[in-house]
């Protein structure tokens, strides 16, 4: 019997430590395989090969590629909500807060860009992915709009619509992160380090929202 299958002797085994580790290995392998082949071309065999697992093990946890991507996208959303969408603390400088949240977003996107790219592409043709992607964006826009309103209370971004500004800025951030990490971006032969990326984006965003660097 396959080594992965032999670990599963009852319905509760997938929730075990071994089952959780196998599930996580498949998700990590999926990110690697999608980064190389793209979601539309990647095969289950590519994913399990990258994960060091058997195709049979894959189907113990996921019905197919779409189900796997939905779970990866849910993980991506959880990271964003926890690390990026947190509101400023009372008395926290808005510029510092924005810079810290941007640094977190860049780090998450750098690690999970295959998921974000795949989900965005699927949202063009699949209604479930379209709704999921829209929900993630709306949460991000609302969180950013709240920071814009706080900045406006301190004299920044005077007269601008907070939600439209938040939508414009988050769209710019998302595409810049995609463009700087994707193989087909503006700099395919260049590794853009964290500090350089965050410094450039922080300058642009803080100018737009607070009028200062």
Please give the residue ranges for each predicted region.
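Hydrophobic alpha-helical connector segments
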Residues: 71, 85-114, 162-169, 198
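Hydrophobic/aromatic-rich alpha-helical bundle segments in the mid-to-C-terminal region
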Residues: 130, 152-202, 212-213
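Amphipathic alpha-helical linker/stalk segments
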Residues: 8-14, 72-99, 116-117, 147-153
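An amphipathic alpha-helix signature
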Residues: 27, 99, 103, 138-149, ...
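Short hydrophobic clusters on alpha-helical segments that form packing/core surfaces
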Residues: 22, 26-34, 76, 80, ...
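N-terminal intrinsically disordered/low-complexity leader segments
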Residues: 1-21, 185, 213
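Short secondary-structure transition hinges
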Residues: 111-143, 163-164, 191
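Helix-turn-helix
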Residues: 21, 25, 33-67, 71
